[in-house]
Amino acid sequence: LGISPKETMSIAQKLYENGHITYMRTDSLMLSDDALEDIKKKVNKEFGEDYYQETKYKSKDKNSQEAHEACRPCKFSKHTLDGLENISYRENRLYKLIWTRTMMSQMKPAKVEITSIKIGFKDEDDKVSKNNFVSKKEFIVFDGFLKASSVYKKSKETKEEEQVEEEEPEIEQVEKDGKKILEKLKKDMDCSYVKIQASQKYSRHSQARFTEASLVKKLDELGIGRPSTYSSMVSTVQDRNYVEKKSIEGKEVKLENIKLENDEIVEKEDKTKIGGDKNKLFPTPIGEIVNKFLIDNFSEII
């Protein structure tokens, strides 16, 4: 959603106070029997009985405090709060996300068909090379829980969302065209190239800097804090100037692209920027000093 943890909890608090969602400061995965029954009715009515699958979740975290239900909508009949007074754009977006994820939790998994295509070639001695061009294509056979996202996208809220919805038919057409191409392919058939293009790419660093959201996820994985404290923890390290949220521009690098077409090799040079970060958390000099002090003196608990 592009919303900070602090603002997310503030928005969730308003939704809770207005009776739209249940208590949000919980790490429980449990849903009440009444809620499960209401979800079942909604899924069967909205998507059909083929999409419903009852699932009862249990937290794997031994320290989980399941005193409340999982955060969920109070009324499953409302997938959006559009039209209600005093409901902001962001409040509606968060509510719709909670509604969608809750519905998905009681729906069948999606089924995907994966087709792999390998194109080999012969070397100068007319021997088949061990190297292959490999391509994989996924087709959704049964959309399952993904069907709930179609309801999430029903209302057009921004020009950006309108553009996405306008592009969907084109995406569906690409899927259909892709299937038609695959149907024409046969095992061991000969094929000739029309164009072969190789483009230079730079891989991203495996350990990216934290965003506020990814930091919360990491805290949860490490068992540090609780849902009620994540927001304040992320805010505190920024308020104390241990870290700062900022964006940095990447450096410009050259890319070499090679194209083989009509038995002619064409080399082209492009430029791109790498190493940039947007809205990431960076340690400050104070943060680095505090971190070193903690490691030197409290290494056994860090």
Regions found by a protein language model. Name each.
Residues 1-302:
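Core catalytic DNA strand-manipulation module of type IA topoisomerases
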